[in-house]
């Protein structure tokens, strides 16, 4: 009986550890490593390595949505919001969805904060439009 319990516990631990792939982040160490090494460690290993890696509890897409909402609500419109907007895009949030998300946030967090966030979101999601236009222009030139 004890062997069965131990085997069951081992298989649960193995399955859990295999299912949760840790996110590898080096931004903290790259940008603050020698200036603030402990902060860099907490950023890379705990925030991203542990918290963001808990995808069974909350998907990366949903974590992006929560993070963006939090940053915009605080009025943070610096490179950290740009980074998280790009992450949200990479995690599956569409241009239509981000427009609706920021519009909704505007009613609760403030209209000026939404305006500022839209400026950054437009840059992140318009990369696709610019790329499409460049490809279309190239194709049109080739047809002439």
Where are these regions (language model features)?
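Bacterial Sec-dependent N-terminal signal peptides
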Residues: 1-21
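Short loop/beta submotifs within extracellular cysteine-rich repeat domains
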Residues: 77-80, 111
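A cross-kingdom feature marking solvent-exposed beta-strand/loop segments within repeated
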Residues: 79-103
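Short, structured motif recognition centered on aromatic/hydrophobic residues
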Residues: 62-72, 81, 98-102
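Substrate/cofactor-recognition hotspot
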Residues: 64, 104-115
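Acidic, glycine/proline-rich low-complexity segments that act as flexible tails and inter-domain linkers
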Residues: 20-62, 82, 90, 114-144
């Amino acid at each position: 009986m004890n062997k069965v319990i131990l085997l069951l516990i081992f298989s649960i631990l193995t399955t859990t550890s295999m299912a949760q792939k840790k996110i590898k982040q080096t931004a903290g160490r790259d940008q603050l490593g020698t200036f603030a090494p402990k902060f860099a460690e907490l950023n890379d290993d705990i925030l991203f390595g542990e918290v963001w890696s808990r995808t069974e509890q909350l998907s990366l897409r949903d974590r992006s949505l929560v993070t963006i909402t939090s940053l915009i609500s605080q009025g943070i419109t610096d490179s950290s919001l740009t980074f998280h907007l790009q992450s949200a895009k990479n995690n599956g949030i569409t241009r239509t969805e981000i427009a609706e998300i920021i519009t909704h946030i505007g009613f609760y967090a403030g209209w000026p904060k939404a305006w500022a966030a839209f400026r950054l979101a437009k840059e992140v999601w318009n990369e696709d439009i610019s790329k499409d236009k460049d490809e279309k222009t190239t194709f049109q030139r080739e047809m002439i």
